[in-house]
Amino acid sequence: MGRTSPSVEGANDLLEVQVSRIYLSCMEMVREVERDLWEMGINVEVQSMQDKQARFMTKEVRAYSFSIVPSIAGHFDVGDMNRMVDYVFPNSTVVEYCEAEIKDRTSEKILNPGNSHKVRNQVWSEFLHDGKFAYTYSERITPQLMTILKELRDKPGTRQAIINIHSNFFMTPGSWSGNPDVGDELDLDRIGGKKRIPCSMYYQLMRRNEALELIYTMRSCDYLTHFPVDIWLAIAMQEFAAGWLGLKCGPFHYFTGSLHAYEKDMKARGIF
């Protein structure tokens, strides 16, 4: 059977799906991503945001992806990464936050609330309940990290080196974090504004061409609050893993189901 032509509405929807680009720097990437969002994003109203049940207007692009290649030396320029963060958060301490957070994530200690939130308290304080967060990346990464790195060391061709962040499956209390005082729950039970759930789905690490690549998959990302931070931290994780394995870095690959910005934040920047 011949392929039927999409409806006008369907064709318009297809236009929102972007072709993946390859960038030579984080700064080049963050500017182009911003332009794509402002010029090609569509207005979408959502009914909850993390642990808030309320209506919010956003601008969104879907199924968005890109890659960034490292330098010829096989590493990403930290100065370039920092400039990317400063581009979205000028005159702030967000780079300092990133530096503290990657230490929490790679400390091999299960930390909640950890240390980094103190640097960016204006964002994170509202999510603290009885002195803890609903989850931390440290809690979710730490029990997996060394096992994944050893697998990459012993089986260079593996496609199974995935560090899961988001989890819809059930675990007994404490089994995810390794801490019996931390009650684990289904992320599925937290949806709809009940509690925070991770925007990140997983990191996939792959050894190819004598270098370590990282594929970062997210369900959702807020450009004006978290995007450059998430990219900085993922690349820093790639550098950490490459260093542990004695490898150079290969390309960094990114995909998100929804890249968006909230009307309230865009108005503050004079955009919406």
Model-identified regions with their sequence ranges:
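Terminal, non-catalytic protein-protein interaction segments that mediate quaternary/complex assembly
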Residues: 2-272
